[in-house]
């Protein structure tokens, strides 16, 4: 009996040019069938017409559902890809902004460094121009310190002489 249903279902699908699933789905339609010796099914015209209209409606509905599902899937894939591309674009825009800020910062630092180099060169030139005066100050300082030493020695010697003179005077 199951073999008869599967063969009748496949024969219906061949006669109606419907996929086997559709023929099985509409197999619940009440149709009077007579088998001929070759295993083909014969039906009356009205039942066959009802089967065709229900089968085509089901096939059309399945095709419509499939198209709608595909459209929704493509829309969601499009949204996903647009989101990914937008995120990548925003990442690259952020990187570009960071690169521009870094470039500006390095330009600013380069300008500051050049300014510092110029200032240091000027200070070095001033130091070189003051060098003879600094050497003269060092020589004067040495002279002052040797004069101070001489003054201390003279003071000590004068105190000695004063003490000797006082001793001689007392005698």
Curated annotation (Swiss-Prot):
How far does the signal peptide extend, from start to end residue? none
Recorded coiled-coil stretches: 135-155
Mind telling me which GO cellular component terms the entry cites?
A: BLOC-1 complex; BORC complex; centrosome; gamma-tubulin complex; lysosomal membrane
Q: Which domain of life is it from?
A: Eukaryota
- Transferase as a keyword? no
* Bias (Basic and acidic residues) ranges: 14-24
Task: Could you list this entry's UniProt keywords, alphabetically sorted.
Answer: Coiled coil, Cytoplasm, Cytoskeleton, Lysosome, Membrane
- Entry GO MF terms: gamma-tubulin binding
Q: Which PANTHER family match?
A: BIOGENESIS OF LYSOSOME-RELATED ORGANELLES COMPLEX 1 SUBUNIT 2
Q: What does this protein do?
A: Component of the BLOC-1 complex, a complex that is required for normal biogenesis of lysosome-related organelles (LRO). May also participate in the coupling of lysosomes to microtubule plus-end-directed kinesin motor. May also play a role in intracellular vesicle trafficking.
Q: What's the family?
A: Belongs to the BLOC1S2 family.
Outline the subunit composition: Component of the biogenesis of lysosome-related organelles complex 1 (BLOC-1).
Q: What is this protein called?
A: Biogenesis of lysosome-related organelles complex 1 subunit 2
Q: Which organism is it from?
A: Nematostella vectensis (Starlet sea anemone)
């Amino acid at each position: 009996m199951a073999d008869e249903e599967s063969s009748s279902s496949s024969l219906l699908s061949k006669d109606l040019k419907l996929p086997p699933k559709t023929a099985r789905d509409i197999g619940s339609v009440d149709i009077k069938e007579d088998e001929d010796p070759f295993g083909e099914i014969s039906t009356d015209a009205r039942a066959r017409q009802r089967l065709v209209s229900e089968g085509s409606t089901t096939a059309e509905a399945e095709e419509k559902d499939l198209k709608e599902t595909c459209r929704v899937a493509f829309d969601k894939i499009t949204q996903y890809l647009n989101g990914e591309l937008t995120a990548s674009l925003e990442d690259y825009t952020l990187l570009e902004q960071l690169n521009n800020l870094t470039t500006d910062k390095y330009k600013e630092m380069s300008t500051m460094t050049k300014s510092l180099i110029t200032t240091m060169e000027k200070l070095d030139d001033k130091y070189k121009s003051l060098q003879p005066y600094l050497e003269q100050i060092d020589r004067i300082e040495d002279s002052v310190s040797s004069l101070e030493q001489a003054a201390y020695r003279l003071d000590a010697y004068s105190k000695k002489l004063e003490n000797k003179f006082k001793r001689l005077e007392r005698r």
